[in-house]
Amino acid sequence: MANELFAGSQVIVYASREATYGTARRLNGTDAMLTISESFTPAEERDVRPDRSGFTDHLDRYRGRKSATFEITRLLLPSGSVTTEPDDDLLWQNAFGRLSINSTGVEYILATAHDWSLTLRRAIRTGGGQGVADFQEHVRGAIVNQVEISEGNQGQNGLATVTFRGVAKDWGWTGNTSVASGYLNIATSATTFRVSSPRQLSVGSLFKVFNTNTGGGSGILVNTVNYTTGVIAYSQSLSATLSSGRVLVPYNPTATTAGQPLHARIGLLSLDGSATKIDHLGGRVTLEDNRGLLNEEVGYDSASRVIRENRRNVTASFGFILKKDEVGELLGRRDRNDSRNLQLNIGDAANKTCKIHMKDFEWDMTALEIPDQGMARVTMSGRGLGVNGNDSLKVRFL
């Protein structure tokens, strides 16, 4: 059999809400989202021993705490219905803390002490194509602590984008292996069996056996792996009995996604919280929530819970071509440190609009850009402030 490759063009990302911090979750096709790019980065303390050994070489390293980071960039995609969350709903919810849905829209509102977490999975889903194979990596105990929305000339080829960044407890992977030799009939009620190559799996791996044995439809979740004996443990009931040689592959279900891109040519920026429009070139709005993970206590090899480490930061920047009648509106108010009720609409159609609201926004001091050729420009940046608490930023899909 050929040693198949993994096709990077066929990536799907899935997000699932964890019931217990750091305990990986199974998934369904409705947990999927389309992405532009993403990265899952594992980390573990591995350093050389500091004691002297009588040699000029380092002889050993020690292992410490594990962690992971992630970044997911995707198009800003309203679902197409004002009462339905977008595909990346769990990422928005985890970053902001609160979700409100009514007959006019889906709204993400900041919260103080939300501490729930996610399992994120990046899958290469090939469908058994010739010369290629499925693969999956995951992070568990993940939280989103930074969101960056880009639109206009700051977006992707004129399309609005959103980037989610965060930290996680641990990283893992799901490769391809098979049921080990010596099995004639593994019962559907079994919770362990040996695999031929245990290093293809890790804690939190999600697999199916052959094409139909999916543990009830959401994949079979690996609880533990013994890399010496090859025994894996799981909790799901098998859909059918197993025997040696049956192939184990990552469980990457068909994605169910929705939404249409929002282009830079549609939308408005208002500095007074209404529909009064001021022309701009594009902008970027960033939320840094400053939640982190507790990964310091004795007795743990990775993070054990979510903690708030500091106050959040909401910032934004927008580019303008400087016009005669707008000097006072931009430079005059900036110089006086006037607060603004800033509203950014990306899109303008029902069911296809994202509204970003910062009701107390103050500009920073910024230099003008006056080139030898072309028109004078200014990039205005500033900070969103809270008024009554947890209201420095709101995002609505209308």
Task: Please identify what each model-predicted range represents.
Residues M1-L398:
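Signature of extracytoplasmic/envelope-associated structural regions
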